[in-house]
């Protein structure tokens, strides 16, 4: 694969390992950017991944957050096209073998910065009742707490016309997407989401899929400034 796929890591080694396995199964050897993890299990996992050459592991001396790959020095050395993701996704079992090339084609078709996986919140699995923090208002800040379905439903409201793919105009932060630098025009969230066989499940939303134990989640949320989950 000539398109590098970056996976961001911070005290969530069990998810990183799961993500690497999914990518390896698709003949992809990803690059892991670790945000100075302190969790012993995560460090052991990263050491094993390095030793077995399942991925390239780059360890940062500081926690740069979920957007570590977009810090100046990192982003500047990335090629014109690359992939980036948080590790906590369950890929679609019917994901096309050429999904990277198809997503790149979607970027070209819509001339958007990124094209990634849609994240359905209605599935065969029960949805968590935990809430997320929503920050609104640029002049006068306002915060409210919403359920996953309340937050995510808006990302399915703007279908786009395409000959064979189900696509929605919707922002993407750091869940899986292919990026095309030449289409960046100042909006980091400029994106489309591809559904159907490209849909992935965000595992922490579904208790039956969530891989983190309470202890592991505590380690993950400690010092994690990127998460919108209420820390309970």
What name fits each language-model region?
Residues 3-15, 19, 33:
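A conserved hydrophobic helix/loop-capping motif in glycosyltransferases and polysaccharide synthases
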Residues 9-12, 35-36, 67, 91:
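Preference for well-ordered, secondary-structure-rich cores of eukaryotic proteins
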Residues 21-30:
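Short, acidic, metal-binding catalytic loop of nucleotide-sugar glycosyltransferases
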Residues 33-45:
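A conserved acidic beta->alpha catalytic loop
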Residues 42-81:
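Active-site-proximal specificity loops/subdomain of glycosyltransferases
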Residues 65-68, 74-75, 90-190:
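Conserved catalytic core of nucleotide-sugar-dependent glycosyltransferases
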Residues 168, 174-232:
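A glycosyltransferase accessory/donor-loop signature
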């Amino acid at each position: 694969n000539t398109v590098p796929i970056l996976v961001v890591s911070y005290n969530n080694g069990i998810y990183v390992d799961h993500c690497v396995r999914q990518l390896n199964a698709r003949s992809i050897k990803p690059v892991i950017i670790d945000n100075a993890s302190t969790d012993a299990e995560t460090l052991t996992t990263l050491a094993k991944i390095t030793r077995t050459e399942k991925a390239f592991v780059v360890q940062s001396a500081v926690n740069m957050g979920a957007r570590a790959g977009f810090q100046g020095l990192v982003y500047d050395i990335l090629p014109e096209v690359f992939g980036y993701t948080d590790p906590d996704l369950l890929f679609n079992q019917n994901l096309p073998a050429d999904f990277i090339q198809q997503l790149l084609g979607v970027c070209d078709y819509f001339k958007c910065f990124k094209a990634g996986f849609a994240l359905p919140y209605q599935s065969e699995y029960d949805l968590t009742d935990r809430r997320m923090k929503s920050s609104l208002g640029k002049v006068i800040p306002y915060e409210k707490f919403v359920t996953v379905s309340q937050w995510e439903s808006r990302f399915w409201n703007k279908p786009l016309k395409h000959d064979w793919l189900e696509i929605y105009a919707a922002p993407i932060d750091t869940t899986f997407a292919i990026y095309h630098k030449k289409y960046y025009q100042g909006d980091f969230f400029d994106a489309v989401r591809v559904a159907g066989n490209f849909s992935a499940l965000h595992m922490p939303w579904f208790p039956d899929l969530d891989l983190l134990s309470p202890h592991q989640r505590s380690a993950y949320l400690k010092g994690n400034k990127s998460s919108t989950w209420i820390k309970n």
